[in-house]
Amino acid sequence: MANVNGYVDLLEGIPDETKEEMVELNNTLDKLDSCLDALEEQNDSLNAKLRDLLQSSQQARQELQAERQSLETEQNTEPSTKSDQEQKKQ
């Protein structure tokens, strides 16, 4: 049994041209697998970055809402000035 590109040739009687085509196809599939692995890594990396961005955005929004509520609370609890009192009388 001959060793063809790391695989034991169990297919006796297959023409050499066909075996060469099979080896080329196997190499092409290996390259495709490597490319898909690289794409998967990039996808995972982008996904992680997007999750971080989303979390950061949510935190910033919560901080802005808390700040806005704090300002509204301060405005509602401030004593009214004379002009406010005069406007209320009119």
UniProtKB/Swiss-Prot annotation:
Domain of life: Eukaryota
Coiled coil: 16-78
Biased composition (Basic and acidic residues): 81-90
Keyword tRNA-binding: no
Keyword Signal: no
Keywords associated with the record: Coiled coil
Stretches for region Disordered: 57-90
Family per similarity comment: Belongs to the UPF0184 (EST00098) family.
Protein known as: UPF0184 protein
Species for this entry: Branchiostoma floridae
